Swiss-Prot record:
Species, as recorded: Arabidopsis thaliana (Mouse-ear cress)
Phenotype on disruption: Minor effect on jasmonic acid response and no effect on glucosinolate biosynthesis. Myc2 and myc3 double mutant has an increased insensitivity to jasmonic acid. Myc2, myc3 and myc4 triple mutant has no jasmonate-related defense response, is devoid of glucosinolates and is extremely susceptible to generalist herbivores.
Function, as annotated: Transcription factor involved in tryptophan, jasmonic acid (JA) and other stress-responsive gene regulation. With MYC2 and MYC4, controls additively subsets of JA-dependent responses. Can form complexes with all known glucosinolate-related MYBs to regulate glucosinolate biosynthesis. Binds to the G-box (5'-CACGTG-3') of promoters. Activates multiple TIFY/JAZ promoters.
Annotated InterPro entries: AIB/MYC-like, bHLH-TF_ACT-like_plant, bHLH_dom, HLH_DNA-bd_sf, MYC/MYB_N
Induction: Barely up-regulated by jasmonic acid.
Annotated localization: Nucleus
GO function term, MF aspect, one: DNA binding
Primary residence: nucleus
Domain notes: The JAZ-interaction domain (JID) (82-141) is sufficient for interaction with MYB proteins and most of the TIFY/JAZ proteins.
Protein name (Swiss-Prot/TrEMBL): Transcription factor MYC3
Upper lineage: Eukaryota, Viridiplantae, Streptophyta, Embryophyta, Tracheophyta
GO cellular component, one term: nucleus
Length: 592
């Protein structure tokens, strides 16, 4: 395929392609062409195939969409000693095949010859894996689906960084989501085009710190932020220290219940080293340690008694496929999980598991190779080898790059993937805060949230402008009322007469008191003043001028004191407490 560093042509039906496929699966000298060798400097983290496969399975099973398969493309380095170039390669790390839930989508468009070619390739692979032992032909009549064949072919592919769908996603640290047949064919990537030919309608590549997670489905699935969040939680983590293995305890749940804490495969997972460490390397720099003497004794004893079994295990572990894996006549049956790996110790677990609850086939391949030594006999030895190796090899100091100093007191600056992840987390927090402020959110996606926030801000602006205009109008009316009270026509002489009469009144003159209570548009008014000069008439006239509708009114007189109470409702103009009190004081008490 275009944009891959290596691939095997399974798509043709000739005998040469089948022979090439057989050689690719079992060849001990040519498997390096399928998957580039791991780099020497710097070492990349090597995943445990069981935990990685279970992560992929958990990702698909927990997703609300119907995903057909999931593949993890793991990064490695192809170092050229002559030129000094270090090329980043994305190779097959592991995969999980679930299949289509819709039975109609399993129908193939291939002819009989193509189906026979696929069955023959899988039968030959099964025959080579099982060592020539006869296999049952119960499932020979079942067809190999297009998506299943596409998933199988993907095992033989690898991509240069920046080339192909996974390479472009990893280079740019972004998500590539192709949904629909038009998007797949128009992407310009040959892998996406092949996926569309073999029945896929959605392909997704999500870059992580250690590789790319690819998902495919025979249905059209729209972009989901929840899926990307799950991928970040499952596959983005730090692999610090010199240990290349990934412990199951570093995850939030036990991904490998079949292996205990003493399983050395969780500690030592170097693909190219399947033998036992020599005593000279183990005891380097720590000759006086009693544990080193015990390790040397154990190593010499093992080399003396078990050298034949170790050599046999070394020969078997050089193959890429495990002999205890079978295709059951070349085809997948209901709820079967197939695992390709170079780990001889995987014989402890059944490679093909059958169930009655799920009718879908599950296909899984892995290129991760672990130590082929006996786990139960050499667990203490391998654990001590790890401890000594960590002590002997000091961490290499990386040269500091010129430029800005790392922020927040970090010794090393964050890489672009970690920085992008933190930026997205901060952006998501801002969106959560914005969603809490906006009252009416139409949809939960970010675009709709921004649109609703803009509409809400514009609405608040219009309300503010309306309130300011109403305030200006009320202020103008109050200014006009105050001017009328000070410069009333024909009322100056009468005001002087009233003031003089008030001065001639008794020393115990009564001051005017106005109490106002506003409840919505309803107002309760209480006026207490003297009974001279008809304050009741002035009060009713003031209510009329202020456009206040009277619902109830009462007037009582005690000696020289008059108490007026009224319940009114505001009309066209809304007054607050201070505005209404000032207006009534001006109208009723202008001649008081």
């Amino acid at each position: 395929m275009n944009g891959t560093t290596s691939s095997i042509n399974f798509l043709t039906s000739d005998d040469d392609a089948s022979a090439a496929a057989m050689e690719a699966f079992i060849g001990t000298n040519h498997h390096s062409s399928l998957f580039p060798p791991p780099p020497q400097q710097p070492p990349q983290p090597q995943f445990n195939e069981d935990t990685l496969q279970q992560r992929l399975q958990a990702l698909i099973e927990s997703a609300g969409e119907n995903w057909t398969y999931a593949i993890f493309w793991q990064i490695s380095h192809d170092f050229d000693s002559s030129t000094g170039d270090n090329t980043v390669i994305l190779g097959w790390g592991d995969g999980y095949y679930k299949g289509e839930e819709d039975k109609e989508k399993k129908k193939n468009n291939t002819n009989t010859a193509e189906q026979e070619h696929r069955k023959r390739v899988i039968r030959e692979l099964n025959s080579l894996i099982s060592g020539g032992i006869g296999v049952s032909d119960e499932s020979n009549d079942e067809e190999v689906t297009d998506t299943e064949w596409f998933f199988l072919v993907s095992m033989t592919q690898s991509f240069v960084n920046g080339v192909g769908l996974p390479g472009e996603s990893f280079l740019n640290s972004r998500v590539i989501w192709l949904s629909g047949s038009g998007a797949l064919t128009g992407s310009g990537c040959e892998r996406a085009g092949q996926g569309q030919i073999y029945g896929l309608k959605t392909m997704v590549c999500i870059a992580t710190q250690n590789g790319v997670v690819e998902l495919g489905s025979s249905e059209v699935i729209s972009q989901s932020s929840d899926l990307m969040h799950k991928v970040n939680n499952l596959f983005n983590f730090n692999n610090g220290g010199g240990n290349n293995g990934v412990e199951a305890s570093s995850w939030g749940f036990n991904l490998n219940p079949d292996q205990g804490e003493n399983d050395p495969a969780l500690w030592i997972s170097e693909p190219t080293n399947t033998g036992i460490e020599s005593p000279a390397r183990v005891n380097n720099g720590n000759n006086s340690n009693s544990n080193s003497k015990s390790d040397s004794h154990q190593i010499s004893k093992l080399e003396k008694n078990d050298i034949s079994s170790v050599e046999n295990q070394n020969r078997q572990s050089s193959c890429l496929v495990e002999k205890d894996l079978t295709f059951q006549g070349g085809l997948l049956k209901s709820n079967e999980t197939l695992s390709f790996c170079g780990n001889e110790s995987s014989k402890k677990r059944t490679s093909v598991s059958k169930g009655s609850n799920n009718d879908e086939g599950m296909l899984s391949f892995s290129t991760v190779v672990r130590s082929a030594a006996n786990d139960s006999d050499h667990s203490d030895l391998e654990a001590s080898v790890v401890k000594e190796a960590i002590v002997v090899e000091p961490p290499e100091k990386k040269p500091r790059k010129r430029g800005r100093k790392p922020a927040n007191g970090r010794e090393e600056p964050l890489n672009h993937v970690e920085a992008e992840r933190q930026r997205r987390e901060k952006l998501n927090q801002r969106f959560y805060s914005l969603r809490a402020v906006v009252p009416n959110v139409s949809k939960m996606d970010k675009a709709s949230l921004l649109g609703d926030a803009i509409s809400y801000i514009n609405e608040l602006k219009s309300k503010l402008q309306q309130a300011e205009s109403d305030k200006e109008e009320i202020q103008k009316k109050l200014d006009g009322m105050s001017k009328e009270g000070n410069n009333g026509k024909g009322c100056g002489s009468r005001a002087k007469e009233r003031k003089s009469s008030n001065q001639d009144s008794t020393a115990s003159s009564i001051e005017m008191e106005i109490d106002v209570k506003i409840i919505g548009w309803d107002v309760m008014i209480r006026v207490q003043c003297g009974k001279k000069d008809h304050p009741g008439a002035r009060f009713m006239e003031a209510l009329k001028e202020l456009d206040l509708e009277v619902n109830h009114a009462s007037l009582s007189v005690v000696n020289d004191l008059m108490i007026q109470q009224a319940t009114v409702k505001m009309g066209s103009q809304f007054f607050n407490h201070d505005q209404l009190k000032v207006a009534l004081m001006t109208k009723v008490g202008e001649n008081y």
